Amino acid sequence: MTTITAPVKRVPIPDEASAPFFDGALHGELMLLRCQACGTYQSPIAYIGVPLRARCVTCFSGELVWAPSSGNATLYSFVLMHQLYDEAFAAEIPYNIAVVETDEGVRMTSQVVDCPNERLEIGMPLEVTFERMSDAVAVPKFRPRA
């Protein structure tokens, strides 16, 4: 007898550079990079995999440290996906892909959850939540702020 298994969503594989981001997510904290020289927060995603060359986007300092964010954000932009590109998402069609802007000024791609797509509005206040994808990985998503 053949067993048919459902498609599984791809799970990010943390590396040395991204470990603080994913460790924070496992503990319920959204971690961002913060420049010690000028205080600018920036997205960690642009630097995952290239920690030795990471520079501040504002002053070009190499003094970047991981810091917890407030977890608050606003919806900057979004698109609704009606076409199936990955079988693992079949049960979620249509789903949203969102760009959120954290209170620290960092824009990141994520998803708004716990909200019908029809109620999504640019500028709506959001708060971070985390989807546990495995024992070792959780990813940030956002929901309407209470």
Regions of interest found by a model, annotated:
Residues 1-34, 146:
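A broadly conserved sequence feature marking short terminus-proximal activation segments
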Residues 3, 105-146:
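Well-ordered alpha/beta subsegment
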Residues 29-32, 39-40, 50-53:
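Residues immediately within or flanking Cys/His clusters that coordinate Zn2+
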Residues 32, 97-99, 141:
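Conserved hydrophobic/aromatic beta-strand scaffold that supports enzyme active sites
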Residues 34-37, 55-61:
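Short, cysteine/histidine-rich loop/knuckle motifs that typically chelate Zn2+
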Residues 43, 47, 61-65:
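Short functional micro-motifs and their immediate structural scaffolds
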